Amino acid sequence: MKKTLLVNLFAGPGAGKSTGAAYIFAKLKMAGVDAELVTEYAKDRVWQEDQFPLQKCQLYVTGKQLLRIERVLGKVDVVITDSPVAIGSMYTDEKPYKDACIYAGKKYENSLNVFIRRQKDYNPNGRNQTEEEAKHIDEKIMNMFTENNMSFMTIAGTENGYDDLVEIIKNYLSMKGEK
């Protein structure tokens, strides 16, 4: 079983998590890294437009995301996700659910938490939040990191920022002797 590096991309909606995750995944695969991309369950539901009450079922949504991540851990060298488990805590006001999301997100010892600094214009297509709400989630994520002693790094949500992260991941794997 491999000791998978879990790369968690954090930011509010529209900051570039999905774009960055796809870009980073593609760059790693093209470099010969055994990597997998775990996409956002909640986004799948938004595109289905079936009025599934995401806000009222955050624990379910987070559980589905957790399953997506868990099923590939130990099978590849790197997993990149645009929907870290702990980010589920941003979408509920119920403390036990918030705590469960954060606890589940912190359990991965071999992880890299990356905050994407918003650089592009906000596109509301496929989102449930306004630009102001998305920026407020950015602030809540930074507070979550601080309040829960979660280590993280920040990169710009740009091609250069994503390239920097690809190099960090490749260097990490080289140090571990995996690539």
PLM regions: where:
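Conserved nucleotide-sensing/catalytic segment adjacent to the nucleotide-binding pocket
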Residues: 50-96
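Conserved lysine of the Walker
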Residues: 17
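Hydrophobic anchor at the beta1->P-loop junction of P-loop NTPases
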Residues: 9
